[in-house]
Amino acid sequence: MTPAFRRADLTGFLRTYGAALILLLAAMLAWQPAQAQLRVDISGTGATQYPVAIADFAVDDTHGRALAEVIRADLTRTGQFRLINAAGSGLNVDSQVAHDDWRAKGADFLAYGSITRGPDGRYDVRYRLADTVKKGQLDGVAFSGTEQELRRVAHQIADRIYEKITGVRGVFSTRIAYVLKRGSTYELQVADADGQNPQVALRSREPIISPSWSPDGSRLAYVSFESGKPVVYVHTLATSARIPVANFKGNNSAPAWSPDGSQLAVALTRDGLSQIYIVSAGGGSNMRRITRSPGIDTEPNFTPDGRSIIFTSDRSGGPQIYQTGLDGGDARRLTFNGGYNISPRISPDGSTLLYVARRDGAFRIASLNLSSGSETLLTDGRDDQSPSFAPNGMQVLYAAIQNGRSVLAGVSSDGRVRQTLSVLNGEIREPTWGPFTR
């Protein structure tokens, strides 16, 4: 949780924060729909924009139009596509595509299809993707689903279009988690990657912190406070069952999953100052200490290969980001620009470090190429927090302040395209992007 490094010195914060946790009340578990009103604002374009036309799906006009709108919205949010008007195309899945005509309209690619309702009440969706330059079909697939599942089908089609055109796997079918504050209530919510279909996993009168996805997307680890102190729980989303996995003396915080989902790296104060430990994701009293430093070590994250951990430490004075092996050997410092770098995240391919950097008095999301050492500031807000990579590494999710309120924001990994998702009846905190699940 970023505020751990935002108030006075680190040691003072832990003392203050630890005392405050005693005041926290019990949380109520729930898995139910959340009624959040959303507005998405997008700015900027990618270095490359692919011209693509998305025709309304034929036969069932109402559902076909809605299906195409979701696909268009998914592709638009990336900033990598330029939508070509396909109104009145009259295409269905069996149509012969006039490639030259669509090329003349400026479309290098054309997506089209049909949606029909079967006798069992389910909808059959068939889609095609044409390459108008090469005058051939790039993709074609059929889906089946209930009316409630059609939005998911649209995301799956958008994923296929994105991958066929860019060569990179799409993330529109993935999920995100975040904490939503409404009045005096805090909710841990899970939603589609576009912020729609939010569900409440946990509700509390007191703050919920540090949500973290399991590698298979079935569980969330987080910190909750029913026992009067911070305890790390693992929560199974399908059943709402949960178990405590770090309930040791002192503060238990900052859970992060190992790549195989069997362990969690956590920050514990059981032996004094905050240090990094590894505990079992299945619970139990066993733990293994990783760091032994005279400073405060926190915010651990496994590298994608599972062989080392990156974390934040003030061992050099101000908070910086380090890497150490699981054997707890000497830690290697990774960040040197500026005197304040926290909240590290590593890209899915292990090539790029993401973190919050204080520059000129503002807290911004930065990325560091671990090979070249080149740093890029991705955002220009005054208080940008909690960065999280998309599972394909192409986008970054974070929390930003807009008009005095905390909102969900996104930026492309090169910093060119930005989007803001405003929840009109609450404030979003600590977003985290879920993994690919299929």
Curated annotation (Swiss-Prot):
Record's protein name: Tol-Pal system protein TolB
Job description of the protein: Part of the Tol-Pal system, which plays a role in outer membrane invagination during cell division and is important for maintaining outer membrane integrity.
CC per GO annotation: periplasmic space
Lineage of origin: Bacteria, Pseudomonadati, Pseudomonadota, Betaproteobacteria, Burkholderiales
Subcellular location field: Periplasm
InterPro entries: 6-blade_b-propeller_TolB-like, PD40, Tol-Pal_TolB, TolB_N
Keywords (A to Z) from UniProt: Cell cycle, Cell division, Periplasm, Signal
GO biological process, one term: cell division
Any single Pfam family the record assigns to this protein: TolB_N
HAMAP family: TolB
Extent of the signal sequence: 1-36
Annotated organism of origin: Bordetella pertussis (strain Tohama I / ATCC BAA-589 / NCTC 13251)
NCBIfam families associated with the record: propeller_TolB
Sequence similarity: Belongs to the TolB family.
Assembly information from the UniProt record: The Tol-Pal system is composed of five core proteins: the inner membrane proteins TolA, TolQ and TolR, the periplasmic protein TolB and the outer membrane protein Pal. They form a network linking the inner and outer membranes and the peptidoglycan layer.
